[in-house]
From Swiss-Prot:
Membrane topology: Multi-pass membrane protein
Family indicated by similarity: Belongs to the AaeX family.
Protein name: Protein AaeX
CC per GO annotation: plasma membrane
InterPro entries, per the entry: DUF1656
Length: 67
C-alpha cells in the first residue's frame, strides 16, 4: 500500500505508481546526463541494456522511498 493518494487530472484517475514513474524518469534523465560526459558509456557493452537496468534501479529506489 502506498502512502501517496490517487492522482486525478482532468477527470482521469492515476494510481500512485504513476507519480513514482514520473519522478524516477526525471531522476533517470538527470543521472544519465551526468554519466554521459563522464565516459562510463565507453566501458558499457550494451548502452540500451545499461539504461534499462539503470532506470529499473532508480525506479526501485524511488518506490522504496515513497512507500
Amino acid at each position: 500500500m502506498s502512502v501517496l493518494p490517487v492522482f486525478v487530472m482532468f477527470g482521469l484517475s492515476f494510481p500512485p505508481v504513476f507519480i513514482e514513474l514520473i519522478i524516477s524518469l526525471m531522476l533517470f534523465w538527470l543521472v544519465k546526463r551526468v554519466l554521459t560526459p563522464s565516459g562510463i558509456y565507453d566501458l558499457v557493452w550494451h548502452p540500451a541494456l545499461f539504461n534499462t537496468a539503470l532506470y529499473c534501479c532508480v525506479f526501485y529506489l524511488v518506490s522504496r522511498l515513497l512507500v
